[in-house]
Amino acid sequence: MGANVLIMAGGTGGHVFPALACAREFQARGYTVHWLGTPRGIENELVPAAGLELHRINASGLRGKGKLSLLKAPLMLLKSVWQARAIMRRLKPVCVVGFGGYVTGPGGLAAKLAGVPVIVHEQNAVAGTANRLLVPFAARVCEAFPDTFTLSDSRRTTGNPVRSELFLETSRPALAGRKARLLILGGSLGAEPLNKLLPEALAQVAADLRPEVFHQAGKNHDEVTAERYRAAGVDAQVQPFIKDMAQAYGWADLVVCRAGA
């Protein structure tokens, strides 16, 4: 067993999938990878399925919360940092790598207090709150897009880690004699503009020219999106989340998606 590395990422696929790609690279180099997340995010499904050990702390955001929650916030942050610190005492990681999500803030602070090097990776052009707060403490700051962290002397523009299975060549039948295949992606949480506008737009395409549709609508948005397709008279396969994205990419001729990691 190699030295331990602790990945911190949670909440959405935009944080978790690049972190999974990074985790695989650490494993290929002989490290043992552990994961720090929360009890509620998508990491609870994806990380154990990837064969990685998931450790959880109680961490959440403050947006949209009431005054009582804001008053409790300092105490909750201290509790989250203490939980993360206890995990790090046990694992003794050689470094922690934060990809964003609520878990990254207290996890990164705990690592700094423990003297563990912190690496930050930001997947988007505009950095999230947790990653921005960790930049002053980070030994290395990685950005997918140039100039996301213009004030950091330790920044490196690395791009986004991509899982190796997405590079596998796939064969699909020629378009002649079949309908085109359209994949619609709004992220793991969905994108309401795509969920609302695509059924309306596809209804205006002649039925004999209309593509096959596979639509990732996001958690809690799949039923209403499927109903929109039915009301528009458009056949579509709608799912809240696509687990096998490599297969979906291999199936599709065209992808409509929103920006994001």
Descriptions of predicted regions:
Residues 15-26:
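Short amphipathic alpha-helix
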Residues 41, 46, 50, 171-257:
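Donor-nucleotide binding loops and adjacent catalytic segments primarily
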Residues 83-97, 104-119, 132-136:
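Glycosyltransferases and closely related glycan-assembly transferases
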